[in-house]
Amino acid sequence: TVFTSGEASKRYLLQNFNNKKFFHIGPPRDFDLFKTFEDNKVLNIDDSDYLLCSGLFEEHEDDLGYYKNLLSKHITKKMICTNPDLIVDRGDKREYCAGSIAKSFEEINGEVIYFGKPYPPVYEIAADINNKKILCIGDNLNTDIRGANIQNFDSLLITGGIHRQEISKLSIENVLKNYDANINYFQKELKW
């Protein structure tokens, strides 16, 4: 079974925010998982009860200041962050992720509920699946591997991801030591 942070956040929203209005922060392509809640989506942030952050708006991919300004009047609302990663590599381009917006929201005293590695809710729900063999896969030592280490689950590090330059310069052993991380397996890439 493959279990994602998006699935974990969807379950949480069904249990806790089912009839609440939300403002979606992220590109339209990220919204497919949350179609169940489409009737509760509002286009004006002022009309929302909470904030659902899955990424950055396509027209504001490089400007975290834009989000601080947008969110500054809404710090009393909870933000649900569906991906705690701060950055992601898409091909050769490094981009901000939803976690960067969430951190910006916290910097202005907003409250964020994170779903995804390394935060416990995604593991608690995944471990409930009755699958006793859990392998956490990812390219980020700060989130993917740290979460696996905290939960004492096996992990597979994708070395061709965000740490590829560090690994190429320092060796995998030294990078793991620098991040105080342990892995069970590693490989360059993962193809579906």
For the regions a protein language model found, what residue spans apply to each?
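Asp-based, Mg2+/Mn2+-dependent phosphohydrolase catalytic module
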Residues: 3, 7-192
